[in-house]
Amino acid sequence: MSARLKEKYVSEITPALVEKFSYSSVMQTPKIEKIVLNMGVGDAVSNAKNLDEAVEELGLISGQKPLVTKAKKSIATFRLREGMSIGAKVTLRGDRMYEFLDKLINVSLPRVRDFHGVSSRAFDGRGNYTLGVREQLIFPEINFDNVNRVRGLDIVIVTTANTDEESRELLTQFGMPFAH
């Protein structure tokens, strides 16, 4: 049983993109390569328990075990030493990636307060899209009662598109609600 969005990509989105950008081959159509979820937990320096909670929440959201990220350099003003654990990240690929995107677009984003669509200016010039989420409570897996602190996370959607225009069209076809 492959993911719903993956089937939609193969049957509907690919032909639409080939027609719009007049690719000579179906293999030229941009596709989503991976989705990276990153949660920076700066306060883990003073309280390591915060990092454990963030790792657990990220695991619930993504459905796989997060990787704990460590500080590359020491920064005295932040009381940070090199090698200290200061965040967590997850890289989603394949069916899990499509299922997460489906859940993000259809369930989580509509739950954001005062939501008018995601910014269309968050492309990086290489066809990748970055989205910041202010609170982890928009995800259905997170139980409101078990949350001690509201944390945000970054969601990076890496595509094989060469331009931002192609990438935006790809994400629009998937149903990403861009603010005009």
From Swiss-Prot:
Keyword Coiled coil part of the UniProt annotation: no
Pfam families reported for this sequence: Ribosomal_L5 (PF00281), Ribosomal_L5_C (PF00673)
One of the record's GO cellular component terms: ribonucleoprotein complex
InterPro entries recorded: Ribosomal_uL5, Ribosomal_uL5_bac-type, Ribosomal_uL5_C, Ribosomal_uL5_CS, Ribosomal_uL5_dom_sf, Ribosomal_uL5_N
Gene Ontology MF terms: rRNA binding; structural constituent of ribosome; tRNA binding
Stored SUPFAM superfamilies: RL5-like (SSF55282)
Alphabetized UniProt keyword annotations: Ribonucleoprotein, Ribosomal protein, RNA-binding, rRNA-binding, tRNA-binding
Biological process per Gene Ontology, one example term: translation
Functional description taken from the UniProt entry: This is one of the proteins that bind and probably mediate the attachment of the 5S RNA into the large ribosomal subunit, where it forms part of the central protuberance. In the 70S ribosome it contacts protein S13 of the 30S subunit (bridge B1b), connecting the 2 subunits; this bridge is implicated in subunit movement. Contacts the P site tRNA; the 5S rRNA and some of its associated proteins might help stabilize positioning of ribosome-bound tRNAs.
Subunit structure: Part of the 50S ribosomal subunit; part of the 5S rRNA/L5/L18/L25 subcomplex. Contacts the 5S rRNA and the P site tRNA. Forms a bridge to the 30S subunit in the 70S ribosome.
Family (UniProt): Belongs to the universal ribosomal protein uL5 family.
Entry-linked HAMAP family: Ribosomal_uL5_B
Protein known as: Large ribosomal subunit protein uL5
Originating organism: Levilactobacillus brevis (strain ATCC 367 / BCRC 12310 / CIP 105137 / JCM 1170 / LMG 11437 / NCIMB 947 / NCTC 947)
